[in-house]
C-alpha cells in the first residue's frame, strides 16, 4: 500500500506532515510523491480561512473520482470531525492524534470509517524524525495550541489549549538534527512566546534560544509566531548576545484601531503595541519586524481603516501579510458580529495597504544596495536564480549552483526591488 501526503497551510502543518511520514516509514508503509500512484492520499488541512477549507473539499472531490482512499488530518479534521465521512473520507485524524495515522492507513482497506481525536503527542519521538523537507533547515514545533481566543480565529478550537514540549526534549531534537548536518532551525508555535508558561519550571522561549545557540553546528535560529502581550523583551536581548539568533520578529498587530482591536479580543491597545515595537528597536535597532493585518473586520469604518494606515506608516514593517476578513464558523465573530463591510470596500482597502507596503519596502531596501551580507542558500526559484535569507530575514536572489544549497555565503547586493534583493556571491564560507 502506497501513501501520498499533501500539505496545506502553515509551517506547523509542514512539520506535522514530516512527523507522520516518519511514523509511516517506521511501520514499513511505502510513501510516494505521486498522488496518482498512491492507494491512500492524506490531506493535511488548513481551516484558518474559508478559501483554504474550500480547496480541501475540492481536492477531496477529485480524489473520490480517482477511487482513492482519503484521510484528513489538520484543522479541517478537527473542525468537521465525523461530517467528513459524508464526503467519502475514510479516516479523520485530529491535530494531536498524529501517532494514529499508521493504524488508520492499515485499516483503511477494510472500508471501516475511522476517527481519532485523542491527544497522543507525548508518544512522538521528535528527535528520530528524519523525513524533513530540507537538508539543512528544520521546523521544530515547541508548543501546540493557543489560549488567546481572538474572536475571528478558529485555531484555539482546532489546535486546542497551549501545551509546551519539555525544553530538554526540544534541545535533544536540535542536537540530533545538527549532528545530521542541519544548521538552521525554526521554532514553531501558534503562540510561540507562550512557550514554557504551562510547564511552570522557568522554561521560556528566550531560554530555549540561548541554550540552542550553544549547540555545535547550529548556525541560525528563527521563531514563529509571536503574540504582543506574551512577547518578552528578553528575546531581543538574546539576539544581541548571539549572532545565531535571527534578528527577525513576526509580531502580528491585526489592526490599528483600538475599537477593532477590542472587538477582535486582542488584549492590547494600539499605543501598547507601538510602545512594544519601540522597546524592541531600542534594544536591537536593526531588528526586522513583520506583521499581519486583517482588513474589513466587522464594524471597520473609514476612521478605523485610516488608523491602520497611519500605524503602518509609523512603524514601517519589513513585511506585511494582509488578509480580507472572512467569518469562520464556530468563532465568536461569526456568531455575534455582522460581516457588514462590503467585499468591494475590503478589497479596495487591502489594495491600498499593499501599495503602501510596497513603497515602504522599496525605501527600506535602499539601505542594502552595495552591501555585503551573509546568507544561507535555501533553494532554486522558478526563474533559475537561487535565493537565501540574511539574519534579518531579507530574501536575496543570486546565481549559484545546486551544490551551494545549505551553504553559508557572502552576497553583495547590486539591485533592489519592493520584494527580493538581487546580488552576486562574493565568498563561500563553508
UniProtKB/Swiss-Prot annotation:
UniProt-listed InterPro entries: Elp3/MiaA/NifB-like_rSAM, Methylthiotransferase, Methylthiotransferase_CS, Methylthiotransferase_N, Methylthiotransferase_N_sf, MiaB_methiolase, rSAM, rSAM_horseshoe
Cofactor requirements of the protein: [4Fe-4S] cluster
Positions of [4Fe-4S] cluster 2 binding: 146, 150, 153
Family, per entry: Belongs to the methylthiotransferase family. MiaB subfamily.
Molecular function via GO: 4 iron, 4 sulfur cluster binding; metal ion binding; N6-isopentenyladenosine methylthiotransferase activity
Subunit structure: Monomer.
Catalytic activity entry: N(6)-dimethylallyladenosine(37) in tRNA + (sulfur carrier)-SH + AH2 + 2 S-adenosyl-L-methionine = 2-methylsulfanyl-N(6)-dimethylallyladenosine(37) in tRNA + (sulfur carrier)-H + 5'-deoxyadenosine + L-methionine + A + S-adenosyl-L-homocysteine + 2 H(+)
Protein known as: tRNA-2-methylthio-N(6)-dimethylallyladenosine synthase
TRAM domain segment(s): 366-427
Its job: Catalyzes the methylthiolation of N6-(dimethylallyl)adenosine (i(6)A), leading to the formation of 2-methylthio-N6-(dimethylallyl)adenosine (ms(2)i(6)A) at position 37 in tRNAs that read codons beginning with uridine.
HAMAP family associated with the record: tRNA_metthiotr_MiaB (MF_01864)
Cited CDD domains: Radical_SAM
Record keyword Nucleotidyltransferase present: no
Cofactor annotation comment: Binds 2 [4Fe-4S] clusters. One cluster is coordinated with 3 cysteines and an exchangeable S-adenosyl-L-methionine.
Domain MTTase N-terminal: from-to ranges: 1-110
Keyword set, alphabetical order: 4Fe-4S, Cytoplasm, Iron, Iron-sulfur, Metal-binding, S-adenosyl-L-methionine, Transferase, tRNA processing
Occurrences of domain Radical SAM core (ranges): 132-363
Record-linked NCBIfam families: miaB-methiolase (TIGR01574), MiaB/RimO family radical SAM methylthiotransferase (TIGR00089)
Cellular component, GO annotation: cytosol
Location(s) in or outside the cell: Cytoplasm
The protein's Enzyme Commission number: 2.8.4.3
Pfam families on file: Radical_SAM, TRAM, UPF0004
